[in-house]
Amino acid sequence: IQSLVSSAVYGTPQRSATGFDTKRMNMLLAVLEKKCGFRLGSKDVFLNITGGIKIEDTAIDLAIICSILSSDRDIAIDTQTCFSGEIGLSGEIRAVNRINERISEAEKLGYKQIFISKYNKFSDKGLAIKIITCSKIEEVFKYLFLKN
């Protein structure tokens, strides 16, 4: 997932998504603005799902949010980190289905840590991947971007 966030130069900010529903991206941006206090209203936001695929699974919401915030803050996220969580309208991170399979697959792909909803029930027996549970976007933001 790639995002580019920059100051809007042509008046009305542009919002564009390739491989992801633009309406859902706009909803996620509205949640970041209204419920989480991130100021993106005057910025262009471009989102790209690499590889030419189209993703409709809401479990990608958390990864989309983190990609956008990473670009906005100009702080890279460790490439060995992945995310699986649906974002609700109040900024909460909702549980997703098949979380054990998602965690296992992330580990097989070489990821060292995964952020998931604290409301997911999962088993970490025999896994080396670090599982970080959060209930709100702000918790993930603090963990990724405000640690010293």
Label every model-predicted segment:
Residues S3-N148:
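Peripheral, non-AAA+ core regions of ATP-driven protein-machinery
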